[in-house]
Design a protein with these regions (language model features):
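Juxtamembrane/interfacial segments around transmembrane helices
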Residues: 41-46, 51, 79-81, 152-165
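Transmembrane helix-bundle signature of multi-pass membrane transporters/permeases
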Residues: 32-40, 53, 106-113, 143-149
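Re-entrant/interfacial helical elements at transmembrane boundaries that shape
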Residues: 13-14, 45-58, 65-70, 120-132
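Transmembrane helical segments that form the transport core of multi-pass membrane transport proteins
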Residues: 1-61
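Juxtamembrane and boundary regions of transmembrane helices in multi-pass small-molecule transporters
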Residues: 111-167
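Alpha-helical transmembrane segments of multi-pass membrane proteins
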Residues: 25-36, 62-112
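Transmembrane helix-loop boundary segments of multi-pass membrane transporters
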Residues: 15-21, 109, 164-167
Length: 167
């Protein structure tokens, strides 16, 4: 397992240094982008990728504990003024509101897994158990059409509207 995780490190480093090239600059955009990928991919690597991009957008590194505190809004304004960033090109300033990026990524990486059977491991397991008990379950796309789009997507849109649209 460790070998597989270690292969993502160069990609995470690249994202930190090239985050502005993605065109995702606001917490609301991170919410939808992270969520869209978390619907179909494992949420842990998706979370790490977007977290690295958010840190890189601010010129920070996920590996640095002081940078983590800065993004979580745990540093005083005086400490923020002395914060050393990785690069200076198109860097968004770190503010006491920068934690909204982490919040948007965290929330969407978790909740969007319910959009598909494969978005979260237990979803597929529950489907299989139900089918073994002779409970009729919708197909992959049937689930999305009957439940994800009409029920979950409006809820996620409301979450975005309330918490992330203004940023």
């Amino acid at each position: 397992m460790r070998k597989n995780i270690s292969k993502i490190v160069p990609a995470l480093d690249w994202l930190e240094l090239n985050a502005e090239k993605l065109g995702i600059t606001h917490p609301g955009q991170f919410f939808w982008a992270t969520g869209a990928l978390s619907s179909f991919l494992d949420n842990a690597p998706t979370y790490l990728n977007f977290l690295s991009a958010a840190f890189g957008l601010h010129g920070l590194s996920v590996d640095n504990p002081l940078h983590m505190k800065a993004m979580l809004g745990m540093l005083s304004p005086n400490d923020l003024s002395h914060l050393q960033i990785l690069h200076n090109s198109n860097v968004f300033p770190v503010t006491p509101e920068s934690w909204k990026y982490i919040q948007a990524i965290s929330v969407s990486a978790v909740i969007f897994g319910a959009m598909t059977y494969i978005g979260n491991g237990p979803n597929f397991m529950v489907k299989s158990i139900a089918e073994q008990a002779h409970v009729k379950m919708p197909s992959f796309f049937g689930y999305m059409i009957k439940y994800s789009i009409p029920i979950l997507l409006p809820i996620y849109t409301l979450i975005w509207f309330i918490f992330f649209r203004a940023f």
